[in-house]
Amino acid sequence: MSHYHIVGIAGAGMSAIAHLLLDQGHTVSGSDLTTNRATEALAARGVRIWQGHDPAYVRGADAVLATAAIRGEHPELTAAAALGIPRLSRADLWREWSAQRPVIAVAGTHGKTTTSAMTALALRGGGVACGFLIGADVPALGGSAQWGDPTAPLVIEADEYDRVFLALTPAMAIVTNVEWDHPDIYPTATDYAAAFAEFAAQVRDRRRLLLCADDPGTAALDVDGQARWYGIDEQIACDPVSCRLAPLDWTASRVTVTAEGQQFDLWYYDRRTFARRFALMVTLAVPGIHNVRNATAALAAAALWGADLQAAGAALATYRGSSRRFEVYGEVAGVTVIDDYAHHPTEVQATIAAAQQRYPGRRVVVYVQPHTFSRTRSLWERWPEACRAAAIVSIGDVYPAREQGDPVALATELVAYLVAYGVVAHYGGGIATAAERLVALIQPGDVVLVLGAGDSNRVAAMVIAQLQRVQAEA
């Protein structure tokens, strides 16, 4: 067994990888500028974690794994190179695991985390002891990653950033949607779509490529008519055997909102008999039509792998979400505060719609922390439509991640642009200021959405704390 040192171990992706390495019997250490719940969980498993970075931390390691967020010189990576310690990436490990065992890869611009979690939960509920590697904590699964039975599939949330998903040769893959993102890696929408086409071409059995028919970006991925399609309602596709229009392979119909969440009927199309058959009624505890699609994909994958579909559906009913995915932080004085990872305009729009579905008749107030200068600029014209349904939108300073720029200037420019298109928008400022300004804007009965992929969840925690303070002083 080997000793892996992970630089940037507090991140969702790297902390999940650490759990898989531990499950395989390896020794893991790590460092990061901050600690969090993820590092606390790893420390409880015996992982030595340093806060900060120092060249001495890599001594004794057999390999150093570094997050993609690191650019340029880094003291630990420089020391590792001087000591002859190999530097690995996520892609290196994914390539190795993909060769060791079957991988079910879940790709797409939006919905990867939830669909990955639902797929793993459906498989396990249906009798398949799969492993999983997900970029968020999933309470229903007991964490973000487990190795599981090495002869069973490993469900991987296949991130397209840095083209890392191209390291996989999946036994099965789901593509939820394809919509241009990560302009720092993919300069044009054509570049982005080409990467997904390359990913889809690497699926070993084309009949195990599941594509969402509701998304126009996936259409080009079915190059030979063998892919399986899923979607909502009575959409049709061309059956490659009969050369006639036929129902989708997996269809969600009669979607209804319930007090607990939503329900729908799942149907499948038998390409051998040309018959459309009822599979089961599915109950979900999470809101949003996008989650109906996610659940349909997960159940289709479980069925194709041979899981018990009825048991898989029952397992999905226990899914209450993942960390930072429509995560209810609390309710104080009639105000519900929800944190979500949404940072692309399409995700922001879907999350607002989910809040309106879950909390009908209540005002939805939204805080958005734009994520990276390149994404904010590249998707500029999408923001008004994404935010239009909110009662009030507060725009925080841009989270730069690995990029350089003026976070205040771009945020205030975005506010002016939204206002020009009729959106009730305000400038929120930095984290602490944004929380204060949100508390001043909200009223009893409001639903507050805190959206972003950076440290925006701190705003949610601060809003809860300030509301509790106001309530105590009343």
UniProtKB/Swiss-Prot annotation:
Compartment annotation: Cytoplasm
GO BP, one annotated term: peptidoglycan biosynthetic process
Top-level division of the source organism's lineage: Bacteria
EC class: ligase
Keyword Coiled coil: no
Catalytic activity: UDP-N-acetyl-alpha-D-muramate + L-alanine + ATP = UDP-N-acetyl-alpha-D-muramoyl-L-alanine + ADP + phosphate + H(+)
Binding positions for ATP per the UniProt entry: 108-114
GO CC annotation, single: cytoplasm
Alphabetized InterPro entries for the sequence: Mur-like_cat_sf, Mur_ligase_C, Mur_ligase_C_dom_sf, Mur_ligase_cen, Mur_ligase_N, MurCDEF_pg_biosynth, UDP-N-AcMur_Ala_ligase_MurC
Involved pathway(s): Cell wall biogenesis; peptidoglycan biosynthesis
Keywords for this protein: ATP-binding, Cell cycle, Cell division, Cell shape, Cell wall biogenesis/degradation, Cytoplasm, Ligase, Nucleotide-binding, Peptidoglycan synthesis
EC number: 6.3.2.8
Main location group: cytoplasm
GO MF, any single term: UDP-N-acetylmuramate-L-alanine ligase activity
Family: Belongs to the MurCDEF family.
Biological role stated in the UniProt entry: Cell wall formation.
Protein name according to UniProt: UDP-N-acetylmuramate--L-alanine ligase
Chain's gene name: murC
